[in-house]
Amino acid sequence: MIINSQEYLQPPQWWNERVEAGNLLSISNGEQEPTNYLMTNVGNGYVAFVIGGESIYVGGVYNGPAINLGDANNLPSHRAGIPNFQNIEISNAQFQYAGLDIENATYTRVYSIPSSPGTIVKQIFYAHQKIRNILVQEIEVDNSNIETDVTLQLSVVGINLTANVDFNILNLTNTQFTGNDYQLYNLTIKVPEVNFMTSVAVTTTTIPQSITIKSGEKKKHHYVTSFLTNIETNDYIEGSLDIYKTTFLLADQLIKSHLDEWNKIWISGIEVGGDSHLQQVVNSSLYYLFSSIRDDWSYGMSPGGLASDGYNGHSFWDTETWMLPPILLLNPKLVRDCLLQYRINNLPGAHEKALSYKSNNYTGFMFPWESAFTGIEVCPTFAPTGILEQHITADIALAIRQYYYLTGDLDWLIDFGYKALKGIAEFWASRVEYDQLNQQYSINTIIPPDEYAVGVNNSVYTNVAVKMTFEWVIEVATLINDTENIPFEHWSSIANGLVILFDEVNQWHPEYQGYNGETIKQADVVLLGFPLMYNMSKEARKNDLIYYEAVTTNSGPAMTYSMHTVAWLELESLENATKQWFRSYNNCNNSPFLVWTETPTGGAVNFATGMGGFLQGLMFGYGGVRIHQGNLDFYPQLPEGTTSLKIRSMNYIGSTFNVGWNQTTITFEMLTFNPSVYLTLLSTEYDNIILNTLDPIYLTFGSKFQIYFNNNN
């Protein structure tokens, strides 16, 4: 496209207002779109792509073997890249400005036409949120004030169907399936993870070489691409074609149903007063997370989101530890039906991994460090993490606990969660080693969250997480009267007898047995205080924080600073929290579209893990939210430079409410009620207010308060 010009169209006032409100990220006045590395994306949790990128990704579609021996010609399991049929270029147009509309989940480019001054062209991309199987592009040409016709030159760039590294592509165009207005392809991966050969049928509008708009006319052209996999149905080819035909006939109506669906998502969110940049970071982080997952497609969440092949598109502990908690407060159904259900669906793979350690006699569910389509281990064999980083199995158990404590969803816990929990406990019972002399249990030869430490013994994070896992499983068994069907005494003995390293003299936790001040990669011991909420004195919490801040590398991921922020706020040291807080979201400031990188200098792009950590710093740090059995705690504080914060439509035990605060007042507002329970607010100012009306409750800023529930009998 033509890009050189001395004068540029200016975005309209409404556009600038949306930028200021934090709902739109924009480039204008000669700024050019960033390279693909820092470019934004559109997605709906089923399908996604980077604008201008060569590949489209469908969740759950991977190419490459589970076991990879490091052969450069034998790519490991990774997201399979579908050619980007939506990558349409208008070659005779001049780029003017563009923006990601976060609220509407659309990306818009605006052009002028040098040969037709006054003609305005808009190119709008979106992944339809309601109809998950389609991508839509609109090219709208406003030639209404021009006295001559205008012709746009179109082409699809970057398409090479014969040299695709991930798929064998069969062109079914001009067969009995299709006509001249659209094209149909059957894409089959080249190498399966194990046995199943995933195929994707793609039906896409044929892109003309040119389109002409008559003088005085304003016209919109639609280009639709539909996807359907043999994961969903055996009739995926005919199904893709049917979806395409149906939606293309309704093309003018697609944008409305897309926006309506995103309006439902944004019922819950976070509002920031006084800092428009921070509001942009918050909204864009939520957008990138929400556009990567959906509740009717349970294929996990990768550190690089759905629009990239970062980390091969695999799911790690990042899902449960970093991304899940902020999503949980806003949309617990999404957590249950996508993130947790992904783990439940893949229990056979977790069992297979446990049994693969034949000389160790492991059993139960040992979740893989890297998981893709089947749930078996897909970490490349040259990386020790796939063998030794095992805390993920405890992390998943504690994520189930978070979900249950927040929702009280006992039916799901009984029907789905409990089976996973029992298998997790069985694994750890087979994994621990008993020291008869000291009558203690150890977990040896492990990699903790600090991945610089390889093959260490008694990682304090791992052991505390495992201890809590056993306590949680026993709690559930007691709740549902199933204690006679588990080895209650043995599991209790392990929970009480695990080695938990602690220096009584200096009141701090060594990271692992023999730790002696080595540099660490990222937050590890600090995670004992949050998210694990392990019982310790304030002195120990502070000592851990001071010690490990000093030995953490400056080139690690941003989540470290989020957790340090949470810790300092918990210790009521606002000044120290502020220093860490600004570092926690520095990794997205290199892109006009606030695309995160893993570290300050680069690494994985569209780093959803960092977004999740950042949002935790806001919600669990400055919101002071803590999820306990039977209650929620709050201790609202304000980040430097802001005038107010609000968590909108937070979910708890089937009810929803707003919690907002400024420099003088905390406002609590009920929105919807679960008729089966009643909520009560307890604070130093109010004693047990039953929350049975929509009338707001006002507390003095600086107050701590608690929401707890009782069943209506």
From Swiss-Prot:
SUPFAM superfamilies found in the cross-reference section: Six-hairpin glycosidases
A GO molecular-function descriptor: hydrolase activity, hydrolyzing O-glycosyl compounds
UniProt similarity note: Belongs to the glycosyl hydrolase 65 family.
Active site, renumbered: 451 (proton donor)
Keyword Chloroplast: no
PANTHER family xref list: GLYCOSYL HYDROLASE-RELATED (PTHR11051), PROTEIN-GLUCOSYLGALACTOSYLHYDROXYLYSINE GLUCOSIDASE (PTHR11051:SF8)
Gene3D superfamilies for this protein: 1.50.10.10, Maltose phosphorylase, domain 3
Role played: Catalyzes the hydrolysis of glucose from the disaccharide unit linked to hydroxylysine residues of collagen and collagen-like proteins.
The protein's name in its UniProt record: Protein-glucosylgalactosylhydroxylysine glucosidase
Entry GO CC: extracellular region
InterPro entries referenced in this protein's UniProt entry, alphabetically: 6-hairpin_glycosidase_sf (IPR008928), 6hp_glycosidase-like_sf (IPR012341), Glyco_hydro_65_C (IPR005194), Glyco_hydro_65_M (IPR005195)
Enzyme class of the recorded protein, top EC level: hydrolase
Glycosylation sites: 104, 160, 171, 186, 283, 361, 457, 481, 535, 576, 662
Subcellular localization: Secreted
Transmembrane portions of the chain: none
Keywords: Glycoprotein, Glycosidase, Hydrolase, Secreted, Signal
Residues given in the record as substrate binding sites: 317-318, 521-522
EC numbers, comma separated: 3.2.1.107
Organism: Dictyostelium discoideum (Social amoeba)
Reaction catalysis annotation: (5R)-5-O-[alpha-D-glucosyl-(1->2)-beta-D-galactosyl]-5-hydroxy-L-lysyl-[collagen] + H2O = (5R)-5-O-(beta-D-galactosyl)-5-hydroxy-L-lysyl-[collagen] + D-glucose
Pfam families to which the protein is assigned, alphabetical: Glyco_hydro_65C, Glyco_hydro_65m
Signal peptide boundaries: 1-21
GO biological process: carbohydrate metabolic process
